[in-house]
Amino acid sequence: MGCLLQAYAAQAGKLSIVIDDVGYRPHEENAVLQMPTAISVAVLPNAPHARLMATRAHSQGREVLIHMPMAPLSKQPLERDTLQPAMSSDEIQRIIRNAVNNVPYAVGMNNHMGSAMTSSLPGMQKVMQALESYRLYFLDSMTIGNSQALRASQGTGVKVIKRKVFLDDTQNEADIRVQFNRAVQLARRNGSAIAIGHPHPSTVRVLQQMLPTLPADITLVRPSDLLNEPQVDTSRPGSAQPPVTQPRNPFSGVKNCKPKRPLEPVHATRFFTVISESVSQSTLVQYFQHQWQGWGKKPFPATGD
């Protein structure tokens, strides 16, 4: 019987759930700490209650991650000390060192936003070098499909795992239930899955309702329990291409000038009048007129001495 139970446990799908953005709203985040301790928290290092919430979570035996702000491709307000691809290794080391000090007991890191940073291979190589010195794993939130995190970890001792499902892209409870069930199905099909959510009241309510009814073949685990699960590198070599910018004054050819007023129609009488005036004023007609009037004749011979 014991062997059967061990075999069943080995075949069970493993589901890991991480709650991001912790450290700003303790009154809401405390509800997360009432859930099973396998639910992990990712704490923003510069949040006002970062140290408090990390300490509370750790005291429960809960896994703590640093939720590191990283630069996105889109323009939006950024957290202080957001990692940028162009930063030097020393600057990235400094920021990560401060984050480790601000989030005690952290055993891993995941990215807050970060589509620009995680798609930069040189940038992520600097991050992995820093993480290796603190023996932290990296949970790739996969905010962009071409993340270079797994590729950047090659040659280091840093383990990389990947998010499969976002629970609460919307705060609609029905949508969150759909995403939770999707995470369960992926864990069952692939052997494991990581879902990321946020401490919204709607997310907390759905988890409170659905965790007690988790299927028997699904086991709730910490992210670090999945570090030896096989990971597929879906990235493309190189970093994300910068957006194409248009020149300030692109030449688009000469534009036709629009008449200020529509052209007036020309009637037949006016047409012949204009023709008559033009003919009468022509040089040839005036010449014949002058000849007819005698201006072109020779003068009479003089009669006197």
Protein language model regions, located:
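Catalytic domains of cell-wall/extracellular-matrix polysaccharide-remodeling enzymes
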Residues: 89-180, 188, 192-193, 198-219, ...
